[in-house]
């Protein structure tokens, strides 16, 4: 019997983030407490999102609105790395970026976790910014998935190409 395998990746559907961004922008423009505060949210580049507002409190409230929209669209908050609010003139700005791909350091942590606590006979290989996990038994692969879901590696993990 051939080996079964799956890939562990950390990717975000950009269209879903775009939808969440537009929903948050619409809410910022219509909500009463955001009127005349200059609060806005927009893309700045391919992977960066910028929030602006007149006060730091309104900026953080706008960030909460955006995070709420991400959660509603089933996007993990670990996939969005929000920076610190910075003041430029009379406007406060906050830039955040999307976190995609598994770094080599995180991939090594995940493979070590699988080797130490996973079922015997399970192999994990680092392939660029993803991880291939293979085994002869599918039950072992499901045990590895539940093991990884129960652990926090600081990034959003997805399990794809299960075969």
From Swiss-Prot:
GO MF annotation list: nucleotide binding
GO cellular component: cytosol
CDD domains referenced in this protein's UniProt entry, alphabetically: YajQ_like
Entries under SUPFAM superfamilies matching the protein: YajQ-like (SSF89963)
Pfam families, per database record: DUF520
UniProt keyword list: Nucleotide-binding
Function: Nucleotide-binding protein.
HAMAP family: YajQ
Membership in a protein family: Belongs to the YajQ family.
Listed name of the protein: Nucleotide-binding protein RHA1_ro01989
Originating organism: Rhodococcus jostii (strain RHA1)
Lineage of origin: Bacteria, Bacillati, Actinomycetota, Actinomycetes, Mycobacteriales
